[in-house]
């Protein structure tokens, strides 16, 4: 069955076997020219078809178990699929095994999955009395609708789908949640059930293993266990508190970045947290981003708390006159920004309302775009290499709605392409995915569990310089508008540290570990030596803790291991008398001895091994 054709890919669309019949192709799908065949396997395109059909299998099973159930939408998403529905019955996660069993029953029944097309009038009549399906239709333009049937179940859908439920053997329902109708919190709350499906048993098994591993590595769990950060309801949702160990980890990353930024010609700047709404109107944020901003009134004037740092950096640029000899100007700031996120999407440090960006803005001439982007790509590689991340790039080009001349866009896009080519970086192209004011490169990193995360962005901006009438004097003594490059490599420290925590499972590499060395004196008489060693290590810029509670040696060692501290030094009579240290090295997975001076030299060298 793995070799069976289930669909084809043509013109960025998946066309299933039933859709080919509806199109009136006498030879079915094989009559379509210029197509890429999609076979029943665990490839991305095949999984889209499989998971879409599994969503319908879920809905069919829900209808059988809860006859009054009504369904909204059941799309394929990054984590599998889901279906939003409502019923008068109370459903909890404890019901998922029962629902899953019914799905398996329908799958074994080998029900044919067929398609018909209806006019809008016919579809409204077919789903008469179903307000959720009417809500779906109200959001769809056009007057032709697809309806897929399997057994006694049918659903409004454009596809694609498998030809038969017999294909669906390897799936799992993963969780139950609430979801507002259409994502609007003013609407009624529906039930959402998530699931995952694969073509093969191995695909499902590997995925479920990854899910269990992800639970162990969940940064919210690690944040508590390792004392990195916390949240407090009295302070507010989405507003993290950095605890001492988390702040140490963050500061280490900030310091390494600052050193690299200064060496690369960036100047530190700092803008205010709140700015008059007048500037947000000039920038366009007031009209296009207002619902994500927080506002306050001071002396009868409206101010907006900044959701981005770009306007402040523009004002720094405008504080002086510039000639072409000054360019490029590179400003950076660890800028604290606030964005209103709905409470339902907040997620640990990954999605918060206050966060700090490793933000920079480069003001340059058009001719300097390629060299500046090339330097950013080099910088990005150094950072990702230091943390052991693999990454990929995606170039987003001009959208249908945009500003600027065609030649200017082409020149800017080609500059990004040439910079990527210069670094021999394979990249994907998102045609039409750029911002209305310029092309961009997105940086996506892959973690230890092979999950992809959107982090940094390199964005060429031809809009804000025009809105704020930025200028520099060119070599012909004429005023010329600079290009502005928005650049964040980590994205935000909060998000990056969340990803870093899950990537390493809390076992941070030595150079950024919140506690790098634990000193464990065996008895009280060894405490003085431990404090002396602590001071020596602090001079080497090492984060060190002395575990001197009145506990057994084994308990103190277990505590240090539980805290995932890279190096543990047990200090007893022999170590005090000989100054030869006993070291437990997590990274080397070894225990060894080393003279004190040699050890201090070693850790000092380890701290100098990593730079961006």
Curated annotation (Swiss-Prot):
Identify the main location: cytoplasm
What the entry lists under Gene3D superfamilies is as follows: 3.30.54.20, Anticodon-binding domain, Bira Bifunctional Protein, Domain 2, Threonyl-trna Synthetase, Chain A, domain 2
List of residues binding Zn(2+): 310, 361, 486
Tell me where the signal peptide lies. none
- Output the InterPro entries linked to this UniProt entry: aa-tRNA-synt_IIb (IPR002314), aa-tRNA-synth_II (IPR006195), aa-tRNA-synth_II/BPL/LPL (IPR045864), Anticodon-bd (IPR004154), Anticodon-bd_dom_sf (IPR036621), Thr-tRNA-ligase_IIa (IPR002320), Thr/Ala-tRNA-synth_IIc_edit (IPR018163), ThrRS_anticodon (IPR047246)
GO cellular component assignments: cytosol
Reported cofactor(s): Zn(2+)
Residue span of region Catalytic: 218-509
Q: How is the cofactor bound?
A: Binds 1 zinc ion per subunit.
* Enzyme class, spelled out: ligase
Record's keyword terms, sorted = Aminoacyl-tRNA synthetase, ATP-binding, Cytoplasm, Ligase, Metal-binding, Nucleotide-binding, Protein biosynthesis, RNA-binding, tRNA-binding, Zinc
Q: Which PANTHER family match?
A: THREONINE--TRNA LIGASE, CHLOROPLASTIC_MITOCHONDRIAL 2, THREONINE-TRNA LIGASE
Q: Which family does this protein fall into? A: Belongs to the class-II aminoacyl-tRNA synthetase family.
User: HAMAP family, per this entry?
Assistant: Thr_tRNA_synth (MF_00184)
Protein name, per record: Threonine--tRNA ligase
Q: Which organism is the protein's source?
A: Helicobacter pylori (strain J99 / ATCC 700824)
UniProt lists the gene as thrS
């Amino acid at each position: 069955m793995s070799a069976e054709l289930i669909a084809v890919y043509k013109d960025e669309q998946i066309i299933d076997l039933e859709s080919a019949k509806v199109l009136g192709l006498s030879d079915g799908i094989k009559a379509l020219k210029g197509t890429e065949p999609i076979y029943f396997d665990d490839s991305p395109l095949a999984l889209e078809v499989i998971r879409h059909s599994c969503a319908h299998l879920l809905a069919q099973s829900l209808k059988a178990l809860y006859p009054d159930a009504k369904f909204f939408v059941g799309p394929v998403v990054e984590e599998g699929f889901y279906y939003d529905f409502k019923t008068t019955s109370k459903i909890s996660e404890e019901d998922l095994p029962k629902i899953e069993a019914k799905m398996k029953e329908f799958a074994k029944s080998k029900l044919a999955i067929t398609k018909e097309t209806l006019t809008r009038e016919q579809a409204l009549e077919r789903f008469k009395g179903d307000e959720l399906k009417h809500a779906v239709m109200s959001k769809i333009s056009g007057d032709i609708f697809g309806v897929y049937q399997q057994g006694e179940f049918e659903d409004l859908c454009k596809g694609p789908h498998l030809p038969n439920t017999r294909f669906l053997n390897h799936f799992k329902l993963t969780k139950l949640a609430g979801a507002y109708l259409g994502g609007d919190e003013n609407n009624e709350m529906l039930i959402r059930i998530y699931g995952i499906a694969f073509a093969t048993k191995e695909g499902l098994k590997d995925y479920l293993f990854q899910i269990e591993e992800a639970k162990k590595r969940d940064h919210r769990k690690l944040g508590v266990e390792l004392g990195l950060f916390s949240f407090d309801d009295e302070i507010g949702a989405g507003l993290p508190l950095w605890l001492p160990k988390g702040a140490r980890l963050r500061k280490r990353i900030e310091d390494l970045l600052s050193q690299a930024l200064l060496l690369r010609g960036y100047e530190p700047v700092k803008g205010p947290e709140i700015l008059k709404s007048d500037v947000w109107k000039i920038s366009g944020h007031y009209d296009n981003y207002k619902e994500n901003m927080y506002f306050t009134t001071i002396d009868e004037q409206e101010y907006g708390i900044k959701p981005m740092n770009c306007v402040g950096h523009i004002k720094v640029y405008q504080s002086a006159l510039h000639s072409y000899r000054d360019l490029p100007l590179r400003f950076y700031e660890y800028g604290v920004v606030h964005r209103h996120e709905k409470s339902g999407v907040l997620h640990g440090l990954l999605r918060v309302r206050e966060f700090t960006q490793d933000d920079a803005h480069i003001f340059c001439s058009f001719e300097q775009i390629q060299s500046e982007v090339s330097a950013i790509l080099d910088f990005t590689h150094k950072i990702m290499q230091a943390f052991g991340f693999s990454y990929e790039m995606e170039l987003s080009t001009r959208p249908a709605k945009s500003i600027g001349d065609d030649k200017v866009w082409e020149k800017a896009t080609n500059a990004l392409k040439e910079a990527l080519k210069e670094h021999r970086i394979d990249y994907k192209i998102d045609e039409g995915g750029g911002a209305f004011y310029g092309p961009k490169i997105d940086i996506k990193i892959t973690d230890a569990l092979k999950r992809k995360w959107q982090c940094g962005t390199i964005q060429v901006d031809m809009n804000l310089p025009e809105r704020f009438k930025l200028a520099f004097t060119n070599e012909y003594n004429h005023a010329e508008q600079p290009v502005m490059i928005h650049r964040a490599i980590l994205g935000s420290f909060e998000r990056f540290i969340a990803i870093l925590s899950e990537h390493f499972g809390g076992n941070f590499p030595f150079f950024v570990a919140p506690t790098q060395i634990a000193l464990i004196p065996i008895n009280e008489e060894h405490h003085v030596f431990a404090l002396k060693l602590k001071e020596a290590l602090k001079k080497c810029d090492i984060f060190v803790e002395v575990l001197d509670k009145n506990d057994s040696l084994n308990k103190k060692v277990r505590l240090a291991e539980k805290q995932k501290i890279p190096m543990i030094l047990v200090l007893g009579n022999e170590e005090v008398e000989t100054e030869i240290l006993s070291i437990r090295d997590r990274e080397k997975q070894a225990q060894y001895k080393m003279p004190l001076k040699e050890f201090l030299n070693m850790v000092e060298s380890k701290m100098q091994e990593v730079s961006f």
